[in-house]
């Protein structure tokens, strides 16, 4: 199938979701050769990935991931119909590759949101293009990443936050590592990671590196069954909600997708410069994360609060971003957010 798919894509013809599922199945099981994988993802990048193609690829990648069972399904039979009430699991994640070299905003947000009572399954990896990825900063903070899937599950169920280290949970991706490294360009795999949380997070804030991906990936999340989420792109290039300028946001609900643009002033934040948000290596970024969680005021706290607010809305912990900002600020100022970091360090080392 992959040979036929390459021929079609080279002619600028789209694949159906079913066809993409078949091709990705060949890639994830080692049936496709490295040359075929490289040709396929390059041709797909040149054509441009469709919602159908990304959705099909994400379904296969989810299927092959090591499953993290972090929530409980509650069966309610005290009704005429049977209803399964799933416990909310949230992910805050970005595609990376935005080139801004800011500190680890979404990683900091994860601790704040979990301190508000939301179970967070933070999916991430080491740095690819920036100085410090989420795994790098967590390791520097003292979190042990070399843990079993069962321990990850315990982190989420016992303390409300766990880190899902992508390489450890997406073993089938090993077949694509060589071709991806050798061609050295962004491909569909750069956007699949945030779509394939192994804990099955049904609520999400996903940052993307270019504005053209906002509506497209929101459509994919909707197709994949996201209950409530936001896909965001700061118009300064950040794969976060930014406080330097406006942010393009797509809200995903079970009924569809809606698009809007927000400005930091609308939520009571002053604009800052990109330099005020920049990070450094893992050591520098770990210091920044600690300072924000300890309550230090300034632009770094502001950008964490605004991103945490939308995460809390996605998890239905607050009805509006304004309400959510107050919850996030209280979680930091009370010390609960910092306590979540301490708990994660402890549980991963026990």
From Swiss-Prot:
Enzyme class: transferase
Pfam families listed in its UniProt record: Glycos_trans_3N, Glycos_transf_3
Positions of 5-phospho-alpha-D-ribose 1-diphosphate binding: 94, 97-98, 102, 104-107, 122-130, 134
Entries under PANTHER family matching the protein: ANTHRANILATE PHOSPHORIBOSYLTRANSFERASE
Known function: Catalyzes the transfer of the phosphoribosyl group of 5-phosphorylribose-1-pyrophosphate (PRPP) to anthranilate to yield N-(5'-phosphoribosyl)-anthranilate (PRA).
NCBIfam families in alphabetical order: trpD
Listed name of the protein: Anthranilate phosphoribosyltransferase
Annotated organism of origin: Pelobacter propionicus (strain DSM 2379 / NBRC 103807 / OttBd1)
Record lineage: Bacteria, Pseudomonadati, Thermodesulfobacteriota, Desulfuromonadia, Desulfuromonadales
